[in-house]
């Protein structure tokens, strides 16, 4: 076959497919490239496979990129299995291993997903210590006498930890240790996760930006357990790529699920057994990665369609903090209904007194908290015109749960023959049928008993790599559990299609599209300070669809006008998770919350169609100003926030043809927002620090 061109939307993807040779991904382009040619062997293969007994002549240092002779060979088998899915099949030389690599192209977006499926066709076990879900060996090039990709290519990655989610940074490759000097190179940059907190340290995302060509490639790994990505360089003769420069040195990219290096993962593939890698997604486009988020957003919406955006009140954050009672809840319910909320969630602690963090598991209401029963509270919520919701943690059991002693050891994650303990919890294994049945029974009981319309599912433990029990490796046990759990979630969501399911992992510590393709809303953070929550909110649409991103807004009882406004504005272009002491606010403060909710109800139907954009780029956590918006048809909605910055004015670019600039919220507050003298620029003036505004930009 030779060169294979795929043209989807505005993207050209080129493969080299020739019988008896390894399949190659030659490049991803925004324009047709008639001069594309076969790459040097070992440089652009579509799959990298790590086997301990594979002949390895590669001088690579710690890299997992193998610049070595082919291991897999294309044998005349590539197929469009649907209008959007392209599959390439390769075999090992002895025909004992079959690898099918699947590219699923998004509709109306320059993006695709990628994964591989392995099948053992031989009689002997094959041990796999790692396999790429996506591999691209042509991300940039190098030519002596000119500046190198270490200088011209930037990598974007995002720190993500408890209460400090979505902290994007970008650096030149040389500043992360990749110094492309045109010789044999061991340099690499690797980001990885090794536990069930899939986003406990970093987002499973990244990007490469080439300033010479002003192009970016952006990726996400859709794993709820271990994952890794690696960027490095090598020096072949091949010089074509999407991130094309005039250099000979190439920058490669590999995306993994669990592997040996990052999580101690391995899998013994028995005769006839199959293994599927985690799914990944890749998007490309002109400009910096913030611009390419458009393509990723369209792709994500094809994974999960969310159209209903009800206003949620949750009694936890800066409110009852897990100490709810009937007496405390009833006035909050009254005030939430008056404010315009449509769902009222009773968060953790409803099942016990005292150290409720460690007694959960049976999920029976605590009569000391609710003397007439929790049903009294839930009925009252419904009478006030809202749907009731409740908190559950279903993948673990508290160490002080009364029923723990009756659960067999086989139900739990184990290492060294004993259940693994973390954060006062033991982890349940959803590969076990009885564990799934127990969770299903809990869901059925609480949904039917309390007539729920909302379930918040939390996850609060860090178990490192996983479970050894009935698994080749702990990380593979974790992967198998997670796949069983996600399948169970899909089944339960289908049973209760009218119930909204929230994903929470100590806030945003399990914020991946393995989970989010099956959940309705994500708790983005547990951050309690609205000033920090604002920057998390402004960046969160990079990780989560705006219509899935639950943003806390929690005015304190002594909140002044500006803090009430900033609380509301931070959430109004995404999803409102209202908390705080609504029943103790001043009348002025409550009126501002109510106004914000009413404004949100007028714009929310457009949020699932909006394309996020960042006129100033992703925000650092010490940014003085925040500007985040949604492109809509003929208009933009923009949140502008002045944090602790001496400057009262901010200028930022928008699209051409501005007709009008309107302040949507707060309507009665003085905010200067207008077209600047500079073409396509807007200027906003906010008198006070820690203040905000929601703008509408109307175009001609």
Q: What positions do the PLM features span?
A:
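Acidic/aromatic-lined carbohydrate-recognition and catalytic surfaces
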Residues: 105, 128, 249, 352-401, ...
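Conserved, mostly hydrophobic/aromatic
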Residues: 116, 272, 381, 458, ...
